[in-house]
């Protein structure tokens, strides 16, 4: 079955958008076979039979079970005193009965938690999300809109303040709230420490972590000169491959790490090569 706004090109042989209609009440066998690029195959088999009940083409759910009908091929807007949502046309894959709910704030959040539809409904294009909140001006630079997953983790989505409203763009549904990050990133040396002899090493490694808004940038220097460092996001490891022209003797290593709201940490060490 192909959703109306699904633009993938691998449905070249699709008939009637994948909808199968039976004009009888006989029992039919159905096999669904899926192959990957390496010719691995999975098969699902089942039986199906039509009934005499007419297919309901229109939803008969009462309107109080959802807030607004969103159409996939139109601009969709939803506004309350607390939030504002604006989705470009073709942001969703099919028409949806949009749902919205407010729950009270929990630890580490500023203001309510806003449940925007359902996290299991995919979103194709980024849309604008704006949240109203009364937050002290001195704290605004450290706050941002975050999504909250089922495990209670918060994920950074940024945001810019205009008076008492913060606005950003997101590409998912789910629970959203405002959180603050006032904690500096964490830096730890893996194979470097002050005064270490590294003449037998081929690289310098450190771990960098930020548990809240996430790492935005980093800058490494040796003897005041910028060096190229590779960042392994999954392992949180920064690596500098020592170049052949590094002179023998004592050197100074510096690393600056900044998170997404401007908190920063510095690591300084000397080493002997």
Model-found features: residue ranges?
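Proteolytic-maturation and junctional protease-sensitive modules
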Residues: 119-176, 217-219, 226-227
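Short, solvent-exposed loop/edge segments of extracellular or virion-exposed proteins
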Residues: 189-195
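Short edge beta-strand/loop segments characteristic of extracellular beta-sandwich folds
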Residues: 88, 130-134, 203-211
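Long, low-complexity serine/threonine/glycine- and acidic-rich segments characteristic of extracellular
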Residues: 1-52, 154, 158-161, 165-168, ...
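Primarily secretory-pathway and cell-envelope proteins
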Residues: 87, 196-198, 202, 210, ...
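Proline-centered linker/hinge motifs at extracellular inter-domain junctions
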Residues: 182-187
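Predominantly extracellular/luminal regions of secreted and cell-surface proteins
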Residues: 72-99
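Proteolytic processing hotspots in large secreted/extracellular or virion-associated proteins
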Residues: 56-58, 64-73, 99-144, 192
């Amino acid at each position: 079955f192909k959703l109306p706004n699904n633009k993938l090109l691998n449905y070249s042989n699709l008939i009637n958008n994948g909808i199968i209609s039976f004009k009888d009440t006989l029992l039919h066998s159905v096999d669904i076979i899926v192959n990957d690029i390496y010719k691995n195959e999975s098969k699902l088999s089942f039986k199906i039979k039509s009934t005499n009940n007419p297919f309901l083409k229109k939803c008969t759910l009462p309107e109080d079970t959802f807030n607004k009908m969103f159409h996939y091929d139109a601009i969709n807007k939803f506004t309350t005193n607390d939030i504002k949502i604006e989705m470009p046309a073709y942001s969703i894959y099919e028409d949806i009965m949009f749902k919205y709910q407010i729950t009270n704030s929990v630890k580490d959040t500023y203001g309510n938690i806003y449940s925007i539809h359902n996290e299991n409904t995919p979103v194709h294009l980024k849309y604008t999300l704006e949240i109203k909140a009364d937050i002290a001006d001195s704290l605004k630079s450290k706050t941002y809109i975050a999504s909250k997953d089922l495990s209670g983790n918060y994920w950074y989505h940024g945001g810019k303040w205009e008076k008492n409203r913060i606005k950003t763009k997101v590409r998912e549904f789910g629970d959203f709230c405002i959180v603050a990050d006032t904690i500096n990133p964490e830096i730890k040396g893996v194979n470097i420490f002050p005064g270490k002899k590294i003449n037998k090493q081929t690289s310098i490694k450190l771990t960098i972590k930020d548990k809240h808004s996430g790492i935005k940038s980093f800058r490494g220097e040796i003897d005041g000169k910028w060096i190229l460092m590779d960042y392994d996001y999954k392992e949180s490891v920064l690596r500098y491959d020592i170049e052949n022209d590094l002179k023998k003797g004592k050197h100074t290593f510096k690393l600056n790490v900044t998170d997404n709201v401007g908190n920063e940490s510095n690591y300084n060490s000397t080493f002997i090569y």
